[in-house]
């Protein structure tokens, strides 16, 4: 058995309605709680196990079956490749203090990102010596989302506080003062607003560009409920990279994401953003370990390339709390390397693939900066 295996259990008995909303896809036989899952090439083995008792030969104190969702053994430890040192470093401390004083939210904190120490300290965390480029993803429109995706740690409410009208200018002033060349702006979903928050996003981008014309701005957006006018408003605000995450494969959309999100809706948003502006760089992200098959991942990558998405990130899903979806599989670093090579073979200009990669992971690294600037330079002669 592999050194780091993911044991999968299912609560017994299993009702048809529970299975419909579950991530499991095994063959189930009446009167039996034993389930068999397929293993994947170059990936973590998933073992056969009984749903109502601990794995054979393992006396686990306090063992109990997991909740209604299929998932790994609650007593299993994360593989070594997912363990990170505690966030630290001079740049990290300075940036955290600055964000606190300015009352700015970051997705790094709110979504419990495992890379916060590495990104905020310019790559000096668990990722190695780094390149000195500190990256923080500013979260606009508050810290409360109107949607309830079952993978996300951000708090939710049907009626979040109204947007802060001064936030766009305050954010622009703060970011301009940091002396960075690349910034990522994201937001919670705001289905309570007529434009989904697109105008607030656009104001922030315009304010940033006025204060620091040379800065590169990436916006990681919601789907604005599929409102393409809202997409156009943001895409024409001066941003350089339009990012929207498809999150998972088609078959798992309703299980993983809020019902208001949809696979084709996300593709439509990305396609429209690409067509709104010549030279627009588009980007998306896929989580792995939720029960998807290799063929489904390949199809999702092909669908993204078919609408000319330039940048793709792939990372391991990690369960934020017991209330969220459980991890179905720990994907090995070697398999993530395979996905990187496969993505590059499809024509993505840049693929970041690894267990701890997230959609904004090291977004401002030099390769991405050079890619955006090169596209701008190629477009410049046509505008003269």
From Swiss-Prot:
- GTP-binding recorded as keyword: no
* Example of a GO biological process term: lipoate biosynthetic process
Q: Which GO terms describe its cellular component?
A: chloroplast; mitochondrion
Q: Which residues bind [4Fe-4S] cluster 2?
A: 145, 149, 152
Pfam families in the record, alphabetically? Answer: LIAS_N, Radical_SAM
Molecular functions (GO terms): 4 iron, 4 sulfur cluster binding; lipoate synthase activity; metal ion binding
The protein's required cofactors: [4Fe-4S] cluster
Q: What domain of life does the UniProt record list for this protein's source? A: Eukaryota
Q: Which residues bind [4Fe-4S] cluster 1?
A: 108, 113, 119, 360
UniProtKB keywords: 4Fe-4S, Chloroplast, Iron, Iron-sulfur, Metal-binding, Plastid, S-adenosyl-L-methionine, Transferase, Transit peptide
Cofactor note as given? Binds 2 [4Fe-4S] clusters per subunit. One cluster is coordinated with 3 cysteines and an exchangeable S-adenosyl-L-methionine.
Its pathway, per UniProt, is: Protein modification; protein lipoylation via endogenous pathway; protein N(6)-(lipoyl)lysine from octanoyl-[acyl-carrier-protein]: step 2/2
- Tell me the residues of the organelle transit peptide: 1-48
What intrachain disulfides are recorded?
Answer: none
Q: Does the keyword Cell cycle apply?
A: no
Q: What EC number(s) does its UniProt record assign? A: 2.8.1.8
Enumerate the spans annotated as Radical SAM core domain.
Answer: 128-349
Q: Which HAMAP family match?
A: Lipoyl_synth, Lipoyl_synth_plantC
The UniProt entry's sequence similarity note says: Belongs to the radical SAM superfamily. Lipoyl synthase family.
Q: What name is this protein filed under?
A: Lipoyl synthase 2, chloroplastic
Recorded source organism is Oryza sativa subsp. japonica (Rice)
Gene this chain is encoded by = LIP1P-2
């Amino acid at each position: 058995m592999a050194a780091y295996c993911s044991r999968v259990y299912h609560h017994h008995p299993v009702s048809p309605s529970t299975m419909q909303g579950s991530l499991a896809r095994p063959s189930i036989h009446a009167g039996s709680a034993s389930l068999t899952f397929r293993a994947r090439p170059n990936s973590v083995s998933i073992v056969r196990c009984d749903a109502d008792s601990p794995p054979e030969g393992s006396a686990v104190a306090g063992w109990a079956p997991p909740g209604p969702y299929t998932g790994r053994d609650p007593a299993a430890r994360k593989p070594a490749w997912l363990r990170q040192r505690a966030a630290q470093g001079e740049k990290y401390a300075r940036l955290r203090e600055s964000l606190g004083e300015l009352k700015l939210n970051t997705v790094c904190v709110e979504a419990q990102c495992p890379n916060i120490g590495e990104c905020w300290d310019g790559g000096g965390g668990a990722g190695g010596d780094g390149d000195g480029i500190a990256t923080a993803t500013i979260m606009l429109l508050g810290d409360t989302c109107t949607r309830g995706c079952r993978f996300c740690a951000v708090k939710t409410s049907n009626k979040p506080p109204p947007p802060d009208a001064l936030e766009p200018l305050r954010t622009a002033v703060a970011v301009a003062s940091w002396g960075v060349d690349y910034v990522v702006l994201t937001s919670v979903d705001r289905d309570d607003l007529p434009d989904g928050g697109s105008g607030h996003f656009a104001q922030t981008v315009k304010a940033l560009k006025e204060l620091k014309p040379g800065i590169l701005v990436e916006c990681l957006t919601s789907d604005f409920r599929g409102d393409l006018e809202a997409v156009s408003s943001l895409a024409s605000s001066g941003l350089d990279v339009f990012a929207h995450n498809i999150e998972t494969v088609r078959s798992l959309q309703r299980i993983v994401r809020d019902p208001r999100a949809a696979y084709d809706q996300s593709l439509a948003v990305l396609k429209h953003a690409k067509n709104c502006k010549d030279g627009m760089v588009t980007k998306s992200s896929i989580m792995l370990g939720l029960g998807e098959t290799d063929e489904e991942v390949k199809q999702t990558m092909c669908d993204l390339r078919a609408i000319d998405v330039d940048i793709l990130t792939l990372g391991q899903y990690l369960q934020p709390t017991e209330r969220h979806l459980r991890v179905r599989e720990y994907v090995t670093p070697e398999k993530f390397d395979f996905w990187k090579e496969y993505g590059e073979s499809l024509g993505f200009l840049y693929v970041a693939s690894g267990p701890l990669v997230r959609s904004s992971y090291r977004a401002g690294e030099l390769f991405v900066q050079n890619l955006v600037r090169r596209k701008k330079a190629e477009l410049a002669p046509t505008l003269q």
